[in-house]
Amino acid sequence: MLTQSKKRIFKHSKAEYTLRTLNSIIDSLNNNKDLFKKLKTKLIIIDHNSEAKVINKFRKLLKNKFFKNEIINLDIEFYKKNIKNINKQGKKVTNNQISNMSNINQSLNISKNCDDLVYLVEDDYIHKIDAIEEMIFAYERISTQLGKELIMCPADYPYLYNKLQNTKVLLGNKYHWRSIDESLCTFLTSKKIINKHFKKFVSTCEFEHYPFEKPFHDIYKKELCISPMPALAVHYTNINSVYGLSPLINYKKLWQKNKL
């Protein structure tokens, strides 16, 4: 989780958010096993200092699943040496942020060597059961229609409704999608996009910008980034965040549904 100074909507531990996120992703993959078997899906968890009991719960959730999966450790010592100590606001970068920046960097390095599509997910996004299927089918449809690769965010962020702005509306599988110019660090894209803009992506992990995701937003000026209406996944951050709870979603029901 990125630096979070305000209380989240539900009073639970970080691990509880992570476990419910993982559970929702597994359920979403199970919702169309034939599709995700054909796509040779692999789920990788990059862990940093989770308690043994939490790791055991990860393993229990992933046991005997039809898709490949792996839990690896964050190599923070390797990545943190590339991070500047002072951020854009002139403040010292926190240890928590160093961990997050290192995790994103390691995720991007793994993504470079994927076969095709890659989905980077922060550990506080709980998914609807049809989320990943919709993302795959919508990517195929829209990418083919436009003749280019895309970037897709699963959340319908509240900030999108704070002001009037022009957007492109596209038809996915069962959802409408619209163009956006900002996101957080959870998105699906292709290996081609990752490699094309790798240096810009990684710059997010070497210097703490303001906003943090500014290099991503710069990429969206060159590549189409879209998000669904309504959301396919909800970012369970504090209730007042413009990047938090998506509108028109029963987020309490979604939270309870993914209780272990």
Short names for language-model regions:
Residues M1-S5, D47-H48, I71-N82, P154-Y157, ...:
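Short loop/turn segments at strand-loop or loop-helix junctions that form parts
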Residues L2-Y17, K91-N96, F201-F207:
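Short, flexible/disordered intra-domain loops and linkers
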Residues I9-L39:
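Short, acidic, metal-binding catalytic loop of nucleotide-sugar glycosyltransferases
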Residues D47-D115:
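Active-site-proximal specificity loops/subdomain of glycosyltransferases
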Residues I86-N87, S111, L117, K128-K200:
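Conserved catalytic core of nucleotide-sugar-dependent glycosyltransferases
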Residues D123-I126:
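The conserved acidic donor/metal-binding loop of glycosyltransferases
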